[in-house]
């Protein structure tokens, strides 16, 4: 990748392919390509549900505890469960070590992720209880909030929590005038705009959408469609990860 100290790196280059100019990203991906994605559920033995999700160099682990008795008791609701979320970036997750104390950004993201999950968890099945969701970013290379909500949704499913749908997320960015899917950290740093999106695909509902920067109306529509297509791929990977775990478990039980 071109660019010396203090210079903006070359993030988009143009190549001739089959007589057409094609945008190539700094890591070799096409604009509509996701990074390599890995998912695994049931990774923590002491949690009721857990999941590890990797989007390229971004790694997030999520753990779910509950439904369990709400403490303190006065926070319990008579008709449904309360959902508590904690999004946290490990001090070693970034190049510059961060303080262990929650930052304003982490508190805000914990809130928006909780609101997205509340839309799919059938909490009325668990009155007077609490469901605690912890998301820890182990390594940050862009798209941490969308990887976190994807991992949290998988961990809830792994815990057997009833849900209307899974939630999957991805971030779209505008880099050097080109809309690109699943931006990494360097693209995020230099993007003219970035738009994290999370959806419940089978319900066709957008549960999280944030826009940093400026997009025209046409660009916004195209970015949302790009996110939708990427989320469908991620959603299929979520279902595959759950099937893999429970098929393996049933085979072991029948052995």
Curated annotation (Swiss-Prot):
Annotated GO MF terms: 3'-5'-RNA exonuclease activity; RNA binding
Main location: cytoplasm
Described function: Catalytic component of the exosome, which is a complex involved in RNA degradation. Has 3'->5' exoribonuclease activity. Can also synthesize heteromeric RNA-tails.
GO biological process, one term: gene expression
Matching InterPro entries: ExoRNase_PH_dom1, ExoRNase_PH_dom2, ExoRNase_PH_dom2_sf, PNPase/RNase_PH_dom_sf, Ribosomal_Su5_D2-typ_SF, RNase_PH, Rrp41
Enzyme class: hydrolase
Subunit architecture: Component of the archaeal exosome complex. Forms a hexameric ring-like arrangement composed of 3 Rrp41-Rrp42 heterodimers. The hexameric ring associates with a trimer of Rrp4 and/or Csl4 subunits.
EC number, as in UniProt: 3.1.13.-
Gene3D superfamilies: GHMP Kinase, N-terminal domain
Keyword Hydrolase recorded: yes
GO cellular component: cytoplasmic exosome (RNase complex)
Name of this protein: Exosome complex component Rrp41
Domain of life of the source: Archaea
Gene that produces this protein: rrp41
One Pfam family recorded for the sequence: RNase_PH_C
Key words, A-Z: Cytoplasm, Exonuclease, Exosome, Hydrolase, Nuclease
Family, per entry: Belongs to the RNase PH family. Rrp41 subfamily.
Subcellular localization, as worded in the UniProt entry: Cytoplasm
Source organism of this protein record: Hyperthermus butylicus (strain DSM 5456 / JCM 9403 / PLM1-5)
Lineage: Archaea, Thermoproteota, Thermoprotei, Desulfurococcales, Pyrodictiaceae
Keyword Nuclease: yes
